[in-house]
């Protein structure tokens, strides 16, 4: 049974989701959001909150692997850069705790969880609730993080029969 951490990075709100992969499916462990505040806090202060928050989640739940969403190019380049920096803070937190880290596009996550890369957030949330047998809707960023964790569990289980379950690239980051 493997504990998997999913991270939906953001410079204002970073979602996290922890699931246990039993080999026959996934079981919900925890989820939530790391909020950096809505004030005009400096970016470096918000990134430090993301880093510390992810480390705290790792220390609390003890996952051995982490899936994180890749940056997409938004219309606003500044937003994409801030998102990339928040991802970096989360990745460093995972790397410091020696987690195996894999990155997924939003389309890959939607495909793995909802069966189509064009699924909307509500469809993804409903599938997350169904797959993890949740009775209440999680926060949207936490739902996205749980979807990333489920995608990572699915991808890991499909790689194991091919002898790639322990594949690692430099620095422990898998590039799928």
Swiss-Prot record:
Q: Which cofactors does the annotated protein need, by name?
A: Mg(2+)
Report keywords, A-Z.
Cytoplasm, DNA damage, DNA recombination, DNA repair, DNA-binding, Endonuclease, Hydrolase, Magnesium, Metal-binding, Nuclease
Enzyme Commission number, as recorded: 3.1.21.10
Which residues make up the binding site for Mg(2+) 2?
69
GO terms for cellular component: cytoplasm; Holliday junction resolvase complex
Q: Where is the active site?
A: 8, 69, 141
The broad enzyme category this protein falls into is hydrolase
Please give one Gene Ontology molecular function term for this protein.
crossover junction DNA endonuclease activity
The record's annotation in InterPro entries points to: RNaseH-like_sf (IPR012337), RNaseH_sf (IPR036397), X-over_junc_endoDNase_Mg_BS (IPR020563), X-over_junc_endoDNase_RuvC (IPR002176)
Q: Which GO terms describe its biological process?
A: DNA recombination; DNA repair
* Cross-referenced Pfam families: RuvC
Q: What does the record give as the reaction this protein catalyses?
A: Endonucleolytic cleavage at a junction such as a reciprocal single-stranded crossover between two homologous DNA duplexes (Holliday junction)
Write out the residues that bind Mg(2+) 1.
8, 141
> In which compartments does the protein localize?
Cytoplasm
Q: How is the cofactor bound?
A: Binds 2 Mg(2+) ion per subunit.
Summary of the function given for this chain in its UniProt record = The RuvA-RuvB-RuvC complex processes Holliday junction (HJ) DNA during genetic recombination and DNA repair. Endonuclease that resolves HJ intermediates. Cleaves cruciform DNA by making single-stranded nicks across the HJ at symmetrical positions within the homologous arms, yielding a 5'-phosphate and a 3'-hydroxyl group; requires a central core of homology in the junction. The consensus cleavage sequence is 5'-(A/T)TT(C/G)-3'. Cleavage occurs on the 3'-side of the TT dinucleotide at the point of strand exchange.
Subunit arrangement? Answer: Homodimer which binds Holliday junction (HJ) DNA. The HJ becomes 2-fold symmetrical on binding to RuvC with unstacked arms; it has a different conformation from HJ DNA in complex with RuvA. In the full resolvosome a probable DNA-RuvA(4)-RuvB(12)-RuvC(2) complex forms which resolves the HJ.
Q: Which family does it belong to?
A: Belongs to the RuvC family.
Q: What is this protein called?
A: Crossover junction endodeoxyribonuclease RuvC
Q: Which organism is it from?
A: Pseudomonas syringae pv. tomato (strain ATCC BAA-871 / DC3000)
Q: What is the lineage of its organism?
A: Bacteria, Pseudomonadati, Pseudomonadota, Gammaproteobacteria, Pseudomonadales
* Gene name in the database record: ruvC
């Amino acid at each position: 049974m493997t504990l998997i951490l999913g991270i939906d990075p953001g410079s204002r709100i970073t979602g996290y989701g922890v699931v246990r992969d039993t080999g026959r499916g996934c079981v919900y462990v925890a989820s939530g959001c790391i909020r950096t505040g809505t004030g005009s806090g400096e970016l470096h202060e918000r990134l430090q909150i993301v880093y510390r928050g992810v480390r705290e989640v790792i220390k609390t739940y003890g996952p051995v692997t982490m899936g994180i969403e890749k940056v997409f190019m938004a219309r606003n380049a500044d937003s994409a850069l801030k998102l990339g920096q928040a991802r970096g803070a989360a990745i460093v937190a995972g790397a410091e705790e020696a987690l195996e880290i894999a990155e997924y596009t939003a389309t890959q996550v939607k495909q793995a969880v909802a069966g189509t890369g064009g699924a909307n957030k509500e469809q993804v949330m409903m599938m997350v609730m169904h797959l993890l047998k949740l009775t209440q809707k999680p926060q949207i960023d936490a739902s996205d993080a749980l979807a990333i964790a489920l995608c990572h569990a699915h991808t890991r289980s499909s790689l194991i029969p091919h002898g790639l379950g322990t594949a690692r690239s430099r620095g422990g980051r898998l590039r799928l």
